[in-house]
Amino acid sequence: MMGNKIDAKKIMDETGVPTVKGINDLSDKNKIEEFIKKVKYPIIVKAASGGGGKGMRIVTEEDDLNKAINEAKIEAKKSFNDENVYLEKFLTSPKHIEIQVLCDSFGNVVTLGERDCSIQRKHQKLIEESPSSVLTNENREKISELCRKSMKEIGYEGVGTLEFLYENNEFYFMEMNTRLQVEHPVTEMVTGIDLVKEQILVANGEKLTIKQEDIKLKGSSIECRINAEHPESFIPSPGKITQYHQPGGLGIRVDSAVYDGYSIPSHYDSMIGKLITYGTTRSVSYTHLRAHETKK
């Protein structure tokens, strides 16, 4: 139920979590006009299923609305076999903040801090970090408590991520990823908790041994996605890797399956690896990233 964005927004709204204003039923043109009149342009068309920036269109004026909806539907159908789309008010300068949750079948729920995924291209994340440099401890605890409360109410089990837009000190729920995300390593780095291990234990019916008071965010971690793309057009670029040197050392982690002679396929996503750095401060973590990103 939380894997569908429309259903997830309804559920979170019912549990008291603030959501972005939107409209789900696009069959009634009068309701669409009323919604847009209320929130004003720009708005965004979103696919109800899937992710990765597919089935999304930003609309700034009325003349482009029908075209954007039709294009989003076609892309959503092709990508997720579900053409359902909905409209939301488009926030012009938000941060993309997400909260990591871990829940067992005994009603235990913990949050493991946040990730800031605001650096994106074509609605796809490129750089992720934890903790966010824009959140205060008060805001972090406030939204984390809301997430724990909502997950307990719906009886969620496993790992998951609640994604929010954050603007003017306010959080707006967008969607939930009911899986382990690409950017989970930065959370592992600052908490010292192996999310893959915990996910398996929970799936095996075991009780969480981690308590909320045990979770402390230490230091800073940044992840940079490594994509096989043309350097000018950013079009996915399959081919053979003829030279590869994997960076390493203190505060460096690389998640990848590539090697010298590896052939990048023409199918699937263009991401072939992730460079994750850790430091006692954000500045140290960033320095590690800049020093090692060209070595890959």
What kind of feature is each model-predicted range?
Residues 286-296:
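Conserved small/polar residues in nucleotide/adenosyl-binding loops
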